[in-house]
């Protein structure tokens, strides 16, 4: 018997109900950065030059560039274009990077739980240890921000077989680990539905540039092509376009220039008035407010206490 996840049923996008995003918009556009902290010379972590290179001072420093330099250039770019953003954050980032959080708060951006550090993978943990990890991250963000995060993105999209169950039980409303659709859909958990918000495995600078060896111009072209195609497709159905950015990758000057041009193309597009420039939590709030049957999958009942 083929192993199955049991989290959602098959649903062709052509057979689903139509609806509009807030304000009659048709394409929801999200930018999500990944703000990460790594162990020095230990654990997991990418290398900018050599695939599979052991952890050393060079690849540690390259990744730290994102927090010291890259994210600040991204903040400025988002400000210039008037774009909101969400940020997948490792909770250990709070230990030494207060200025990053000050800027996020000033921009009123969203924080998404992203594990403690990208040097570990929650998919390798026993249930009790994974629950402890999720609780640790949630409690840290709640303590520092006054409220827990609504969403979760696993470090390197890592999940165990129980992750959606544990997230639902910890109070999370959505997850971004399942790149199976261009629309949000409901995941089944042992404690009720959990929303899956689209997050890209492909329109992702780490996947494109580090793993597929594309350059900054290639990645920017992907953004433009994705936007142009999805703005056309969204005439038939409401869609979500999410861009995943890592500050130590796209924040390098030779790539940042191309990202700026791509995002300018999007905000200046003739059909930009049909776009909802938003965040994953706003998408989740919208979906939870819909009556049963609108969002694919088995969602919350009509009882508002379950929303």
Language model feature labels by segment:
Residues 2-110, 228, 258, 265, ...:
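Active-site beta->alpha N-cap acidic-glycine motif
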Residues 2-23, 139-237, 291-296:
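Active-site-adjacent pocket scaffolds in enzyme catalytic domains
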Residues 53-55, 72, 79-160, 192, ...:
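Metal-dependent polysaccharide deacetylase catalytic core of the NodB/CE4 family, i.e.
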Residues 77-81, 103, 107, 140-144, ...:
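Alpha-helical structural signal in soluble globular domains
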Residues 97-98, 161-164, 253-259:
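Conserved strand-to-helix beginnings and helix N-cap segments that scaffold or border functional pockets
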Residues 108-120, 131, 168-183, 303:
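Acidic, His- and aromatic-enriched active-site or binding-groove loops in soluble protein domains
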């Amino acid at each position: 018997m083929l192993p199955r996840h049991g989290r959602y049923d098959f649903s062709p996008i052509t057979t689903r109900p139509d609806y509009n995003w807030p304000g009659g918009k048709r394409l929801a556009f999200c930018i999500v950065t990944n703000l990460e902290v790594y162990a020095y010379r230990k654990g997991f972590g990418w290398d900018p030059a050599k695939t599979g290179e052991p952890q050393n001072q060079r690849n540690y420093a390259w990744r730290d560039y994102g927090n010291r330099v890259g994210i600040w250039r991204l903040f400025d770019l988002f400000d210039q274009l008037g774009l909101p953003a969400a940020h997948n954050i490792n909770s250990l980032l709070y230990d030494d990077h207060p200025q990053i959080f000050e800027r996020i708060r000033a921009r009123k951006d969203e924080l998404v739980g992203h594990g403690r550090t990208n040097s570990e993978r929650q998919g390798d943990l026993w249930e009790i240890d994974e629950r402890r990890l999720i609780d640790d991250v949630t409690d840290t963000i709640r303590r520092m921000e006054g409220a827990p995060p609504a969403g979760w993105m696993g470090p390197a999209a890592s999940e165990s077989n129980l992750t959606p169950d544990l997230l639902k039980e910890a109070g999370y409303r959505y997850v971004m680990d399942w790149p199976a659709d261009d629309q949000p859909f409901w995941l089944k958990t042992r404690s009720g539905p959990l929303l899956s918000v689209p997050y890209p495995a492909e329109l992702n600078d780490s996947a494109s540039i580090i793993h597929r060896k594309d350059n900054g111009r290639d990645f920017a072209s992907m953004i433009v092509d994705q936007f142009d195609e999805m703005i056309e497709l969204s005439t038939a159905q409401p869609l979500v376009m999410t861009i995943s950015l890592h500050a130590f990758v796209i924040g390098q000057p030779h790539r940042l220039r191309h990202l700026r041009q791509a995002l300018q193309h999007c905000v200046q597009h003739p059909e930009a008035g049909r776009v909802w420039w938003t965040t994953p939590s706003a998408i989740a709030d919208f979906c939870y407010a819909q009556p049963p049957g609108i969002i694919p999958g088995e969602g919350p009942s009509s009882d508002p206490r379950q929303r």
